[in-house]
């Protein structure tokens, strides 16, 4: 296996690379975004491009100061071909001898395949609640939704936009449980949204339960598939999901912190049951 990115390429020192995100624009090279640094408050964004489907890669390009690129989940491409990336920052605030962690979600927009960038947000103030690692969904009716993990309420939180991501409504909880764990989502070719997440429940389940849900409107969700369900000392986390041109859905995730698992699903074969009151149906 060939190493594609190294933290030392631009920094000149042995430093970690984090959270790689692949994105294929409608036209232009394949893009690989990643973070470089010792930890979240200190890291910066870099990216590379490939014109031969990932066989070879350009030299690393550092994003402008203050820009990190898509923090965990892939960007989306808008109708005007601008690329909109869900991003977020994490840092520690010390006040009255008390240290608290602050998570702020924002968006990063490029109209020229990464040459220049514009920031939208932050979308939360970090005072009432923290949200990070958003997934962007653009529905056929023109509305846009961002779904984020949060420390609070053991729910996935959401915000909505009616103007292609320029402005956003107030945050609210979805009905979907989540144990402060990473998620990912994709719009299917048939116009439905598909979400991969840990559907934790009130019985104390955590990251040992990994699920797939779908929705037509981002409000009412339906259970579609259970990827993992192993009670005990197991962890299945940090999913990534895409749909390929043949219609199949490809999902990768960390399998018990030992390896990466790849699952292929046919969304035409889903047998859907409505998720009511946050309970995964039998």
At which residue positions do the language-model features occur?
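Asp-box/BNR beta-propeller blade signature and adjacent active/binding-site loops
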Residues: 1-282
